[in-house]
Amino acid sequence: MAPNIRKSHPLMKMINNSLIDLPTPPNISMWWNFGSLLGVCLATQILTGLLLAMHYTADTTLAFSSVAHTCRNVQYGWLIRNLHANGASLFFICIYMHIGRGIYYGSYLYKETWNTGIILLLTLMATAFVGYVLPWGQMSFWGATVITNLFSAIPYIGQTLVEWAWGGFSVDNPTLTRFFALHFLLPFLIAGLTLIHLTFLHESGSNNPLGVTSNCDKIPFHPYYSLKDLLGFMLMLLPLMALALFTPNLLGDPENFTPANPLVTPPHIKPEWYFLFAYAILRSIPNKLGGVLALAASVLILFLSPLLHKSKQRTMTFRPLSQSLFWLLVTNLLILTWVGSQPVEHPFIIIGQLASLSYFTILLILFPLAGALENKILNY
C-alpha cells in the first residue's frame, strides 16, 4: 500500500497531528473555540497590518496624514484600516474569554501551557499599545506619554529608562519610529509563541468541562471540531464586519481625529476599552510606584492561579461557591472597565478603589478559601 503523504511527510505529519488526527475530548463546548478564533484573529491582524504598513509613514510630520491617505485614496484602505482597528478589539474579547474559560475549567493546571499563554497576553498588550501610538492622533501621543512615563516610577533607573525608551526627552520622532518597528515585529513573535503554546498543549491534550481524563474516548479533531470551529469563525466574522462597516469608530476615541499636539493636553486621557480595567487599578492608588505595581500585578497575578488552586475538583462545573465567585470577578472586571472610562472624581474614585481591592481579594483569598471549603463540605 502506498504511504499516506499526510502521515509520512515531515511537514504534513506535523499539521496532521495538530489539526486533523489530533485526539480531542468528545465533550468540549463552544468555550474551547476561542483558541482557534485567536489564531484567526492573529492571521487577520498580520494580513491587514501588512497591507497598512505598505502605505504608512513612520514620521511625526507624515504619520497622521499617511493614515488619512490610506483611508481616502487606497483601494479599500478604509476597510483594511477598520478591520485592523476593530480586529484588535475582537482579539482582546477572544483572549479574555479564553482566559476566563481557563480559570473556570481549571485549565491553568497545565502549567506550561498556562504560563506561555500569559506571556502571549503580555506580548499582545505590548503590541496593541505600540500600535495605538502609530496614527499619531492626540490620544495616541498622550497615551504614549502617560504609559511610558510610568517607567519613571522605577527607583534609581526610572528616569534614565524612560528617556532611553523615548530616544530623547519627550515622545517624539524616534519614539514613533521605534514603536512602528516594534509593532511590525511583535506579531511574528506572538505567532512563534503560539506554536510553543500549542506544543505544550498537545503534550497533555485538551482539558474538558468535567475536568476528568478523557483518554478512553477521544475523537479526531477533523471533521468534528474543524467544522465546529468554522461555525465560531462565522459568528466572529459577523460582529467584526458589522463594526468595520457600520460603526467603525464606535470603540475609538474622537480625540484621535485631531493630529498630535504636545502643547494641548486632552481633558480625559484614557486607553482603548480593553485596557481600561488595568488603567482603573492603576488610577485607584494615589502613589505612582504603588499604582504601577498594582497595574503589573493585575495581569501577573494570573501566574499564581495554579498555586492558588485548593479544590480537589479541577473545574468549577460542580462547585457553586467558586462559580459565584467567578461571576463576581467577571462583574468586578466590568465595573473596573467602566470606572476606567470615567473622569477622576467622586464617586468613581472610591468605586475604582473598592473594585480594585475586591479584584485582588477574590483571586488571592476568596478562590482558595472557597476551594478548601468545598472540599470540606464534600468530605474530600
Swiss-Prot record:
Heme b b562 binds at H84, H183. A ubiquinone binds at H202. GO terms for molecular function: metal ion binding; ubiquinol-cytochrome-c reductase activity. One of its GO terms (cellular component) is respiratory chain complex III. GO terms for biological process: mitochondrial electron transport, ubiquinol to cytochrome c. Pfam families: Cytochrom_B_C (PF00032), Cytochrome_B (PF00033). Heme b b566 binds at H98, H197. InterPro entries: Cyt_b/b6_C (IPR005798), Cyt_b/b6_C_sf (IPR036150), Cyt_b/b6_N (IPR005797), Cytb/b6-like_sf (IPR027387), Cytochrome_b (IPR030689), Cytochrome_b_C_euk/bac (IPR048260), Cytochrome_b_N_euk/bac (IPR048259), Di-haem_cyt_TM (IPR016174). The chain crosses the membrane at residues 34-54, 78-99, 114-134, 179-199, 227-247, 289-309, 321-341, 348-368. The keyword Iron applies. Its main location: mitochondrion. Binds 2 heme b groups non-covalently. It is a multi-pass membrane protein. Component of the ubiquinol-cytochrome c reductase complex (complex III or cytochrome b-c1 complex) that is part of the mitochondrial respiratory chain. The b-c1 complex mediates electron transfer from ubiquinol to cytochrome c. Contributes to the generation of a proton gradient across the mitochondrial membrane that is then used for ATP synthesis. The cytochrome bc1 complex contains 11 subunits: 3 respiratory subunits (MT-CYB, CYC1 and UQCRFS1), 2 core proteins (UQCRC1 and UQCRC2) and 6 low-molecular weight proteins (UQCRH/QCR6, UQCRB/QCR7, UQCRQ/QCR8, UQCR10/QCR9, UQCR11/QCR10 and a cleavage product of UQCRFS1). This cytochrome bc1 complex then forms a dimer. Belongs to the cytochrome b family. This is Cytochrome b. It comes from Falco sparverius.
